[in-house]
């Protein structure tokens, strides 16, 4: 297999001087509540997006090339930093959006040549978009000499999603990609914008299963869920979901109506589940963790209505394996409408667990399941400039 470094050299005829890596993420629990000011528990994972960069004084032009689109190279300049330059859902929008977000703060992207490489499947709910945004943010900061905090970087990348891509996302993905810590989950308070690392129990592996259903968050369903929660909050006469109890939601069921009631019930119960899951994780209470993950998935399926048959089959298969055999929890991860499931399993049974998932998935849908084992990873990072050498 040709290395990414050799591919870059063949494409551009020069050697890069900078390598940037940004991981994907899974979320253990706390779905669709980051944009409601709740707490979430994501993990940065090993699959990642890599940028190789060669600074150039080519009139300020920025050349972008993705290894997944070998025949296409893009040349852009600061005047191109306007929302929706090209069709929605194109990866270039994320890159241009980050450059635009920094330009709004007076930080311009110097001319450079960029090669983009990925081991993250796009549309699998693993935050490939946030990884790409964060990688480009680090690129801009390194080349411009103007760095910022992990939080400010995440906020600029979030602005990219809102204004350039059209997805009203919360802050979880960008923060988890930027602040990931090896062997730890991150307890992120999205209202206070604070991060507390929580060490994962030794001996647990993360199994990620791609449902094969690609999700597209800019198509309106994600926005509808957020708008429904905002409407429910207004009906409940509160300014924060942190102030609302399940009792209050139940009391106002008739006023909310069926759809808003279900959205509100998910919001308040998911916030409570995150608090309980954090305590269970710290105290290594595996059965409690598994139950909370199952309750979370059921709520996303029934109340928030963002699951799909493929996700449900994978989660059910996980719990059918049995906690007594080393299974510690399963749920959909990410915004839903397809994407992936996350499974916590003991490292000694990870391989047999994957075969179990593949068998159940094949039987249900007649196609092969793509899944992999991963670990909690460090967040986005730069590689020292003098360590990059092409193969001889």
Language model regions located:
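Gly/Ser-rich oxyanion-binding loop with an adjacent helix/lid
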Residues: 1-20, 27-30, 35, 39, ...
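C-terminal nucleotide
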Residues: 1-25, 50, 54-88, 187-329, ...
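Short Gly/aromatic-enriched secondary-structure transition segments
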Residues: 37-44, 225-226
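Short, amphipathic alpha-helical segments that act as regulatory/interfacial helices
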Residues: 45, 99, 103, 230-233
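A structural signal for short, well-ordered beta-strand segments
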Residues: 114-116, 209-211, 341
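FabD-like malonyl-/acyl-CoA
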Residues: 130-131, 340-344
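Glycine-rich phosphate-binding loop
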Residues: 337
